[in-house]
Regions:
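Structural motif
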Residues: 74, 160, 187, 216-218, ...
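Terminal low-complexity tails and localization/encapsulation signals of metabolic enzymes
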Residues: 1-48, 81, 85, 135-160, ...
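Conserved NAD(P)+-binding/catalytic subdomain of aldehyde/semialdehyde dehydrogenases
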Residues: 156, 205-267
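Conserved small-residue-rich beta-alpha loop and adjacent elements
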Residues: 136-210
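Short alpha-helical
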Residues: 55, 92, 96, 107, ...
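Short loop-to-beta-strand entry elements in the cores of soluble alpha/beta enzymes
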Residues: 82, 175, 180-191, 195, ...
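Glycine-rich loop-to-alpha-helix module at the N-terminal edge of alpha/beta enzyme cores
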Residues: 44-133, 144
Length: 267
């Protein structure tokens, strides 16, 4: 049973969501089960999030797949404008995002706000860089011919993020994918889901179309297994432990996914 209200004193309480974002809708797990999230300083339960299984994760992937053609068809400038609005909204709501982050992750409020600003900078950067994914023209080994290289979005991507930087690692992975026309699924760490969900609220307000960005929560074994085995997911980005990274690499190898791995404390 989900808590009916957030105990946090936010300027905008609607940023605190105890639901997952799938296809533009805020939904619960099919089973009705949820996972409590605790304040590491006090042990107090600050809220609960849905315990998604493979079926719900599959629907998130399908939502991203359905949104992909229209999103990739937009001009890079059009995608950039949406991301710029998201950048502005993150900064405008920095105090609330910092409070959510501190409550679930435990870092000092000043550090949390610093991370929010840092997280926003990734969105700003890729909003502009997405307009410069040019491609290339390469000389051929025959006279009068050239090789044209065109850069295209890979399709649906998945991002699995850690607990220690619950905002910055999401925007660092999400920003470039969205900027170049990919659609994705974000699976935040189970200890720190509310920061990710709040960013999802702001992404909706910025005008991000339904299904372009989906945010799921639930047991890592079930959600991760679907993300790594589903052939629709063409790319996986993971930041976390070397032990878990090895498992994900092995799972992704079966469908030959593109992978980006940032493993261990010295990655």
């Amino acid at each position: 049973m989900l808590n009916p209200a957030a105990p946090l004193q936010l300027k905008d309480p609607s940023l605190f969501r105890q639901a997952c974002l799938v296809g533009g809708k805020w939904v619960q797990a099919d089973s009705g089960k949820s996972t409590p999230v605790r304040n590491p300083a006090t042990g107090e339960v600050i809220g609960e999030v849905p315990a998604f299984g493979r079926a719900e994760t599959r629907r998130a992937i399908e939502a991203a797949e359905a949104a992909f053609p229209a999103w990739r068809a937009l001009l890079a400038k059009e995608r950039s404008l949406i991301l710029r609005r998201l950048f502005d909204l993150i900064l405008a709501n920095a105090d609330d995002l910092a409070l959510i982050m501190t409550s679930e992750q435990g870092k000092p409020l000043a550090e949390a706000k610093g991370e929010v600003v840092y997280a926003a900078s990734f969105i700003e950067w890729f909003a502009e860089e997405g307009k410069r994914a040019y491609g290339d023209m390469i000389p051929q080994n025959q006279k009068g011919r050239r090789i044209l290289v065109m850069k295209e979005p890979v399709g649906v991507f998945a991002a699995i993020t850690p607990w220690n930087f619950p905002a910055a690692m999401i925007t660092r992975k999400m920003g470039p994918g969205l900027a170049v026309g990919c659609t994705g699924i974000v699976r935040p760490a189970s200890q720190t889901p509310f920061t990710a969900l709040a960013i999802g609220v702001l992404a909706e307000r910025a005008g991000l179309p339904a299904g372009v960005m989906n945010i799921i929560t639930g047991p890592s074994g079930e959600t991760g297994a679907e993300l790594t085995s589903n052939p629709t997911v063409r790319k996986l980005s993971f930041t976390g432990s070397t032990e878990v990274g090895k498992v994900l690499l092995e799972q992704c190898a079966k469908s030959v996914k593109r992978v980006s791995m940032e493993l261990g404390g010295n990655a």
